[in-house]
Each structure stands twice: as structure tokens, then as C-alpha cells.
Amino acid sequence: IPAIGQTVREHGALFHVDAAQGAGKVAINLTEWPVDLMSFSAHKLYGPKGIGALYVGPRAEQRLQAQIHGGGHEGGLRSGTLATHQIAAMGAAFALAAEHFAEEAATIVRLRSRLLKQLGAIAGCCLNGSATQRIPHTLSLTFSEGEFNPAALLASIAFSATSACNSASNAPSHVLLALGHDALQASRTIRLSLGRFTTEQDIDQAVQLIKTACASAPAFWQ
């Protein structure tokens, strides 16, 4: 992000970063990073849905224009009565995330390693993206062998077949296609997320359910 931000500034443009998935999971330094705008979402950190925040740096203040006009709330950028209870809850959620950041990050990395080690025994299971340059809690996994169908796990594991912001589309993920997958491989991809309340038992149970489904559900898998 710092490298991209520096390049953007050299061309006089503003740099916005969507930090919804990263906040509370990776270190963010707005004091040093050349970022002009950064957006956050409360529910990604166990806060309420329907509330977020936008960091506006000094370079962006004079160029940002209001889209909702009226009473001039929120520094004149977004008029309308403030949702005080949601704002307070978001602040509390972010404070808790900051307080337990190091502890939770270490736990999530340990659980992720446990999950990946066990999934490595499943033929054709592939981790999408970089193994190191990634957020720690979310995994995109493609099962390229057999007749894998994610519907086989619907009754036992909470997972996603796409990003939440793209869930209404039946088209293959353009991100997976850009990574080199074809449409069939993209359809055999699931996303698993680890969180504050995930346990080792959850990891072991999920892997066992996936293995069992591979072996006992030929109509769906192979």
C-alpha cells in the first residue's frame, strides 16, 4: 500500500484504500502511509451492520464533495441525523479489536496453519493467492479434482462461494479468472473465514466434514 500510494501521489491523484477486511487483522498506519482516504466497516470487527467510517486525509479534504446535502452533518460531507448508538458501538468494537490485536492475530495465524496443514491431505485442494501477502483470517480454496460441488457442504459448514458484495451474481469470479482459473475451477472454489470465536475443534470438525463429503458423496464430489 505505501508503494502504491507513493506512485499515485506522484501523479497528483487521490488514493483510497478499502480497509473493511484488513482493519483489526493487519497493522494500519495512517500517520506514515501515503493514503488519502480509507474506509472501514463495523460489522467486520463484530460491530453492528449498517455503520462505517471514512478517514479523510489533508490532501482529500478540499477535493471531497458531499453527496447528501441538508444540515451539514459530519463536517458537511454527509447530512442527516447521526446514528449515535451505531457510532458508539462501532467505536467500542474497534477499541476491543485494538486492545486484543496481537493476541487475536497470533491465534488466527495458528488456526489457519492448522487448517491448511489438514486440507493439504486432500488431493486437488489449492490455496488461492499468496501464502504470505494476505490477511490472516480468510482463505479462498479451490478443489480442482473430481466432481466437486460446494452444495455438498451446505448443511454442515458455513462458507461462501463468492464475496458477499458479489453474491447476487452467478457469473464466475473475475478475481479467480484473473488468477488463472477457468469457469469450472471457479465454481469449485469456496471461502472459509476464521474469527474471534473459532476453536481448534471447529477447524478439525470442518476438515473432517470436508474429507467425509469427498469420500461418501460421489453424486456431488467424484
Which residue stretches match the model-derived regions?
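Pyridoxal 5′-phosphate
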Residues: 1-222
